[in-house]
A protein has these predicted regions:
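All-alpha prenyltransferase/terpene-synthase fold signal
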Residues: 1-190
């Protein structure tokens, strides 16, 4: 896998090193939060965010094994997996500046909306863009059986097409057929 034009940690080294690096980054984050004179609300927001992102990632992995998921399930998953990370970051910034509770909530909700928009756009770009532009591998979601927003919309338009598509073994061909279907059915404008 490629992210921002570079190999991911698990690709460059291995999965164990990637997990260890993630654990180390978490420990550093917690040290920064607990060593500073931050209000408990900031640490609470961080911990809640961390758990929520883990739950979202678990749902994403679970959905790989499911044949179909609903739009509601998808939106719940991306809210937890992607949106919550952005919302938590904004919320912590708002708490650091000691904004009132109402404004903190507005900022958090703004982060949720930005996160959903980002993830849906990223899902479409994975199919409709190219590796050079995106600076990341674009077939990983297809290979892993991820339930992305374009896949969900394609399923809603024609479930038989998606079943036939998954029988194709060539990932490049799958992406070509998906692009064609998305454009023909005007799915990218929904």
């Amino acid at each position: 896998s490629i992210r921002h034009g570079k190999k991911t940690v698990h690709e460059k080294w291995n999965v164990s090193t990637a997990i260890l690096a993630g654990d180390a980054m978490l420990a550093i984050s917690l040290n920064l939060l607990t060593n500073a004179k931050y209000d408990y609300k900031i640490i609470e927001a961080f911990n809640k965010g961390l758990l929520t992102v883990c739950e979202g990632q678990a749902l994403d992995k679970e959905f790989e094994e499911k044949k179909n998921i609903s739009e509601k399930q998808y939106l719940n998953m991306i809210e937890k997996k992607t949106s919550y990370l952005i919302a938590m970051s904004i919320e912590i910034g708002a708490l650091t500046y000691e904004l009132n509770k109402k404004d903190v909530k507005k900022m958090f909700n703004f982060g949720i909306s930005i996160g959903k928009a980002f993830q849906i756009q990223d899902d479409f770009l994975e199919i409709m863009s190219n590796t050079k532009k995106m600076k990341k591998s674009l077939n990983s979601d297809i290979i892993l059986g991820k339930k992305t927003y374009p896949i969900l919309l394609c399923n809603q338009k024609n479930n038989d097409f998606m079943i036939e598509l998954m029988e194709i073994k060539d990932v490049k061909k799958i992406i070509q057929e998906l692009r064609k279907f998305i454009i023909e059915k005007n799915i990218d404008n929904e």
